[in-house]
A protein has these predicted regions:
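Metallocofactor- and cofactor-centric catalytic cores in central/energy metabolism, strongly enriched
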Residues: 1-84
């Protein structure tokens, strides 16, 4: 199963409030808490991508964020999307 994980800027390792305006970024594989998530999902699951976005950017640009995230999810052919 191909999994994509969405994290905010803090849990994605970008920083705190000073990075809250960061637009959507993509990283290959598991980042931060995604490493534990991958273990918990078991051998059948592989966390193929992590999406990271600043909290303030997400609130102020919801439509653009959703469109960009869906584009990446579809392109990656993910079976599961986990936010948080």
């Amino acid at each position: 199963m191909r999994v994509i994980h969405y994290l905010n800027q803090f849990f994605g390792g970008l920083g705190g409030e000073e990075k809250a305006g960061t637009p959507l970024e993509t990283r290959d594989g598991a980042i931060g808490p995604g490493k534990l998530l991958e273990q918990l999902l078991g051998a059948e699951a592989r966390l193929v991508m992590t999406l990271i976005c600043g909290d303030n950017y997400a609130v102020e640009n919801q439509e653009a964020l959703i469109a960009a995230a869906l584009e990446r999810i579809r392109a990656c052919k993910a079976d599961l999307f986990v936010a948080g």
